[in-house]
């Protein structure tokens, strides 16, 4: 609401993606709840799969990666994603980078104790 865009405008998500069974399952459920059927059409990746969990610094690094993904029209793969949990059935990018013209992107950061944030980025015009 505060971003003045529709959830249908988001066309890339940098997930919190800790590669833990509960987190990935619940993050997938949350994306389905927010985006409905559109969730299945949004490319998603996890930066943590490549750099690990940097705790308090994770959100800043992932925000920078999201901004660079918009600038370069490219998203990195989720490293080591070979057989996702059946409940994690969205468009998780794996294997190789994907070219993508990104207009709006979302970067999720979820912390211990319920400190949760989703940042929305827009392509500079």
Predicted regions and their residues:
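Conserved "HGTGT" condensation-loop signature of ketosynthase/thiolase-family condensing enzymes
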Residues: 1-125
């Amino acid at each position: 609401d505060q971003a003045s865009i529709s959830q249908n405008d988001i066309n890339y998500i940098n997930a919190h993606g800790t590669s833990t069974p509960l987190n990935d399952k619940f993050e997938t459920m949350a994306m389905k709840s927010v985006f409905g059927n559109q969730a299945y059409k949004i490319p998603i990746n996890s930066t943590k799969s490549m750099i690990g969990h940097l705790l308090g610094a994770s959100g800043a690094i992932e925000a920078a990666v999201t901004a660079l993904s918009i600038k370069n029209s490219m998203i990195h793969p989720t490293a080591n994603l070979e057989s996702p949990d059946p409940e994690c059935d969205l468009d998780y990018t794996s294997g190789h980078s994907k070219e993508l013209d990104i207009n709006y992107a979302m970067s999720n950061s979820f912390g211990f104790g319920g400190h949760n944030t989703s940042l929305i980025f827009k392509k500079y015009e």
